[in-house]
Amino acid sequence: MNYNKAMPNIDKTPRFSILILNWRSEQHLPGCLNALQAQSFKDFEILLLDNGGQEAIPNTLIDEYPDLQLSLTRSEKNLGFAQGNNLIAKQARGEYLVLLNADAFLEPNWLSIIQDATLAYPEHFFASRLLKANEPEKIDGEWHVYHVSGLAWRHMHNQPQSQATNESKEVFGACAAAAVYPRVAFEAVGGFDEDFFAYMEDIDLDFRLQLAGYPCLYVPEAIAYHVGSASSAPRSDFAVFHGHRNLPWVFIKNMPGLLFWCLAPFHVMVNLAYLIMAPFMGKGKVMARAKWASLKGLGDAFKKRWRIQKDRKASVGDIAKLLNWNPFAPLIKRKF
């Protein structure tokens, strides 16, 4: 069900469609919307999904923000991050999709800076600097790093802001807590893979966009403050299950050509290492369930791989340059 507010110039295509999925993070939503209301660049719409049938967001919320072009959709079931964002992305009219967590708060010039970046780099998608909302002197993440082993992480996570990367550069991908995608690119690659439900789905999207010929640009001046883990604890059974079930699927679907066959043994070893270590961290059962579920999905993953690689535009060399090859990086990964 949709609750829409009539706005002036509703037929005008907005520059940005901002997609916000709410799942147990409604306490942060006013701060998120207040930050959007304060944006210096105003050409955007907001599509908000109240996910999971909790009706945590009152219908009156729309009336509390008369200056925002805001649409509220409700889902009776928890669709997960992937399917939930795909649902509201289909309603979007903007030229660019902004994926924004409900617990992420943009600085007032964030959209203005991103607008300038889209004009200068129209074929790119964009990563922005995330700082910890409760410790703004620390970095929550700058961009996604993808290692040759198949592991992935946020660059500079938990490092002091004084060590932040201050130059714009092409990177592997963007953390979808505050990321920007050309709508045509998002649609061209099919949006998020809904089989993922949550965790690793934005890294999978990064990879597919890169393979399709859409590079990612890190824009350090665009700063957002991110609470993080507002909807699920980072080491919860839910997070461990989905993250480790989805880990091999990303690798199998996306790693191109010769790189796949050269790196697959290392990826297998990484998965076996997690199975061995998990019992010592109290996660043995959930890790075993995750890897078994991943194995059961390998057939579908290879079918998707065939379709993705058939349409690949980026060369194997292009992708190789985006990967992290440092053998020690997974051990001290935050700075790599």
Show which residues each predicted segment covers.
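Conserved donor NDP-sugar-binding/catalytic core segment of glycosyltransferases
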Residues: 105-147, 151
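Short aromatic/hydrophobic "clamp" motif used to bind/position activated sugar donors
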Residues: 97
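Active-site-adjacent helix/loop segment of glycosyltransferases
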Residues: 212, 216-306, 317-322, 326-329
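Short, acidic, metal-binding catalytic loop of nucleotide-sugar glycosyltransferases
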Residues: 34-43
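A recurrent flexible, glycine/aromatic-enriched loop bordering the glycosyltransferase active site
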Residues: 139, 148, 159-184, 203-205, ...
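A short, conserved alpha-helix in the catalytic core of glycosyltransferases
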Residues: 172-223
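Short beta-strand/loop segment that forms part of the nucleotide-sugar
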Residues: 44-52, 71-75
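Glycine-rich, basic loop-to-helix element that forms the pyrophosphate-binding segment
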Residues: 75-92, 102
